[in-house]
From Swiss-Prot:
UniProt cross-references to Pfam families, sorted A to Z: Aconitase_C
GO molecular function, one term: 3-isopropylmalate dehydratase activity
Source species: Xanthomonas campestris pv. campestris (strain ATCC 33913 / DSM 3586 / NCPPB 528 / LMG 568 / P 25)
UniProt xrefs under PANTHER family: 3-ISOPROPYLMALATE DEHYDRATASE SMALL SUBUNIT, 3-ISOPROPYLMALATE DEHYDRATASE SMALL SUBUNIT 2-RELATED-RELATED
Name of this chain's protein: 3-isopropylmalate dehydratase small subunit
NCBIfam families the UniProt entry points to: leuD, PRK01641.1
Length: 215
């Protein structure tokens, strides 16, 4: 998992509340067991005018020119502004996979659905909760300034505007540690690889008959 320390990126404003996981990545794309290939179908039913199917060439599909991510000014955005209860609905880890593969490093909203919030941390996507008034200010700034960028400083737990205004955000210390060091569940386990190896050696020495078939 890529470490997240500090990120400055173009901001896209998704001014919708209660965006659910089926809107983030529709159900027909969940058949794959891989973690890749979901970015092109992020917000599929909003980005395109037809119905998407797995394996289709999206370059030939008609775009919904009224959807914010299709606006030229937001191409390459890596910070997403959203409204309350982002990521609600069914539990699917594909939702943060799709956001991450599209290019988003952080999503900023007044609130998130619990399961989506937890899944995001496990997949290197930083969900940031800010107050409604702070979100309103960010939406206003973003909509009024083309090429608007924000800096997300995870170490300092600050979102910094171009004019120098900063917003503090809270994050669990363990989750912060994992993101700063790029540690997913596998990475955390590998930190104890030496201890695991010592246990296996001791276990094999004490009960060798359990390992006969492995020799």
């Amino acid at each position: 998992m890529t470490p997240f320390t500090q990120h400055t990126g173009l901001v896209a404003p998704l001014d919708r509340a209660n965006v659910d996981t089926d809107q983030i990545i529709p159900k027909q794309f969940l058949k794959s067991i891989k973690r890749t290939g979901f970015g092109p179908n992020l917000f599929d039913e909003w980005r395109y005018l037809d119905i998407g199917e797995p394996g289709r060439d999206n370059s030939t599909r008609p775009l919904n020119q009224e959807f914010v991510l299709n606006f030229p000014r937001y191409q390459g955005a890596s910070v997403l502004l959203a409204r309350e209860n982002f990521g609600c609905g069914s539990s699917r880890e594909h939702a943060p996979w799709a956001l991450d593969e599209y290019g988003f490093r952080a999503v900023i909203a007044p609130s998130f659905a619990d399961i989506f919030y937890n899944n995001s941390f496990k997949n290197g996507l930083l969900p940031i909760v800010l107050a409604e008034a702070e979100m309103d200010a960010l939406f206003e700034q973003c909509l009024g300034n083309e090429g608007y960028q924000l800096t997300v400083d995870l170490a300092a737990q600050r979102v910094r505007r171009p004019d120098g205004v900063e917003y503090a955000f809270e994050i669990d210390a363990f989750r912060k540690h994992c993101l700063l060091n790029g540690l997913d569940d596998i990475g955390l386990t590998l930190q104890d690889a030496d201890a695991i190896g010592r246990f296996e050696q001791g276990h094999r020495a004490q009960q060798p008959w359990l390992f006969g078939a492995l020799q």
